[in-house]
């Protein structure tokens, strides 16, 4: 029963919550196609590569491969790739082929393929999500899609995209709306992604099931890395099979009921296949996850082996692949990422000190419930310091709750577990997001935004007037991406401001020294506020959007907050002190 494999922490609702449609197609049509892209450094084809259809005299830098299988016999099929302006950059015909044992491409069962070389390619990344237009034409049908030229791999325990180390600034996201539940509209998806972009988030884990297909297409367009997760979670239902459900017995037989039970292998593999087949052509998907909190054993081993055989072009992930009994050993060769939830910093350091062969990913960290998330800067210090840390996904994006009208004073009312009279529920444990159910940001999201800012001050020599700023982007020149200005604050009041000129390139993960020698007031507590703003419009963000800031103390002869000193010189022993700021009122009696 699939119910045992769907124990995700969320409101569980019934009914049809995604679009269902019927599609009429020609009998002789392309049944399925798979698109992969790879980069060829230096202009030479990789060893063992199939013949390449070249696009003019331009040097080969990227290759797009399209594989297909037909419904009722092959028909002439033309594949064309055009750039954003509509100019055709490569074209060719699907031809029969037989995959060899050393075939590095995607899929099983494909009978035809074409390889197209693209000279001087515009590569896809979350920082620059450039998409080409793919057209597949048969006598009775035209299929269109969008393609991002990119390559993801692990070398030296470092995740790389297009040859450069990759950092995932991600969140775990459920489909959840206070009014419509898991039925999510297109504008709802755009709103989520816009909020994420505004807060320097570049990655999404589809926890814990495949999302609406349109969501992945938006991630392609707007620039997000996606870990696409299979609909597979059994962490609570495992114990239902145990006659003795005591904790000691659960530990002893932690994975036997489902994860290490061959009777569940077909169901587990099927869910993995459904996830991969549907999103195999999405450039935003850089990793497949076999599920969440299902324990580990023969079922997950089989699912992950299938993924690596079918799609060696992406990474594989599964967090619950540890074992309770030290006598047992399982197959981890099909897992590319070492994944942990909520580890202590020391656990991360111990792993990195062990000379690992897999990158470390925080698949869930900094639980955002209540006054969380906490320790964000501590985690990001170690992420920034070691390329083998490829980032992580904060748990989680939004609070889960059900809209229940408004209170007498007009505020929205949301219900959570137990408010409906149900006997079995999670209480408020699904109210654990960075935003409210109706997408109002919580304070923790503002902190996350600044921790993940694209640049930061690493040194300021006040005597020499030299400010050193590091570019924390993975693929983009900071001078192209951001404008930098500063303000001098005296007791919190701006007394001077100026733009800083980025006249030289600042490549990813490098630093630049800028002249910054403002006049510092002789009295008061003073700070240098360095502000990063978006240099030009992006699909979801307007130019001048504030990306983050640094605040650096400034020395002067006094250093005391004069406003506090003035209050001390004129104490008030009666009445009330009222502080107002941007509509927020605090009364101190």
Task: Pin down the residues of each PLM region.
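Secreted/periplasmic carbohydrate-active enzymes, especially glycoside hydrolases
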Residues: 1-218, 222-226, 271-272, 286-287, ...
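Substrate-binding/catalytic cleft of secreted carbohydrate-active enzymes
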Residues: 193-196, 203-434
